[in-house]
Amino acid sequence: MLDFAQLPPEVNSALMYAGPGSGPMLAAAAAWEALAAELQTTASTYDALITGLADGPWQGSSAASMVAAATPQVAWLRSTAGQAEQAGSQAVAAASAYEAAFFATVPPPEIAANRALLMALLATNFLGQNTAAIAATEAQYAEMWAQDAAAMYGYAGASAAATQLSPFNPAAQTINPAGLASQAASVGQAVSGAANAQALTDIPKALFGLSGIFTNEPPWLTDLGKALGLTGHTWSSDGSGLIVGGVLGDFVQGVTGSAELDASVAMDTFGKWVSPARLMVTQFKDYFGLAHDLPKWASEGAKAAGEAAKALPAAVPAIPSAGLSGVAGAVGQAASVGGLKVPAVWTATTPAASPAVLAASNGLGAAAAAEGSTHAFGGMPLMGSGAGRAFNNFAAPRYGFKPTVIAQPPAGG
């Protein structure tokens, strides 16, 4: 602390009048008071919400934990609001102390006038006629000195009292201190994962760089490398595989079905070679079984054919020669029934059948008998209705019997 009594009034007055005044201090006081009001409102709202939840629908251990964690925060808000209000009050007190010291300080122009008057009196004091005036001027200057020193001492004391503030306490910790360590571990894992991802990115780039082995080689060597599929590789559109060209690409496509080398190469090779090979082995086993049973089947077939050949001479005399001769004698002598050619024996042994008999045998009325036939044989009677045949049980018409006929096709008109 300065000893203001040792300083002339010119210095003390200059110090008081040179500052920005009480404006900044009053603005700080208003800010502290606004902060105190905001903290009080927040604490009241927070307390009302917690009380409403705890006394209302939210019950149980989780509600109790919430109340236990939130209550210290509400208390801290109220305490901090009180401290902010006190800081605002102290700032107002400091501003008031400054105003009081400012009004108690001698204005610098008055001090300058006193000094100028003294200099003039001294300059014109030839015969000592200005001695009394000089003493009065010096006494006035001493009063100014004492007045400024008292004002500065009072202002220093008031300012020291205004700066006596209670320290602000931090809010109670409600987080888990171990969370920082866990977060650091997570960050480490993320960095490691990024390094692995970078390695996975660098490896394909390095492999892709191998495709430029023959970049600075002679043209004939470059063409040979492309023909063999050692260069000219390109990545697929989605970057999942390497498309191989040249002879190597043809070989890869023949083995896997595609010229692209990716994660599915193993499965494609299995599906193209291993699975068909297993199917071929299964078929070979079936063919082997057939080849094993074929001699036995051939032996049984030959034995059956030999027995049939031995029985043929005994079966020949049983063939009715009359039937054969009749058939042989009728060759080239077909009879006509309507527009069709039929064997002659049909017309010689089969009498004409009346429409009424046909209608009765078919279960139809007279109208149906008069209606024209629509089947292929027209009005020709069935073979079973003729006389002198071997099938005598069909010689007479059978009532209620419905014969099966072939319908006339559309192509027949």
From Swiss-Prot:
Q: Which InterPro entries does this entry report, sorted A to Z?
A: PPE_C, PPE_dom, PPE_sf
What Gene3D superfamilies does its record include?
A: PPE superfamily
A GO term (biological process) for this protein?
Answer: response to host immune response
Q: What happens when the gene is disrupted?
A: Knockdown of this gene in cells with simultaneous deletion of PPE25/PE18/PPE26/PPE27/PE19 genes result in a severely impaired growth in phosphate-limiting media.
Membrane-spanning regions, if any?
none
Q: Name one Pfam family in it.
A: PPE
- SUPFAM superfamilies xref list: PE/PPE dimer-like
Family statement drawn from the similarity comment of this UniProt entry: Belongs to the mycobacterial PPE family.
What's the name of the protein?
Uncharacterized PPE family protein PPE65
Q: Which organism is it from?
A: Mycobacterium tuberculosis (strain ATCC 25618 / H37Rv)
* Recorded name of the encoding gene: PPE65
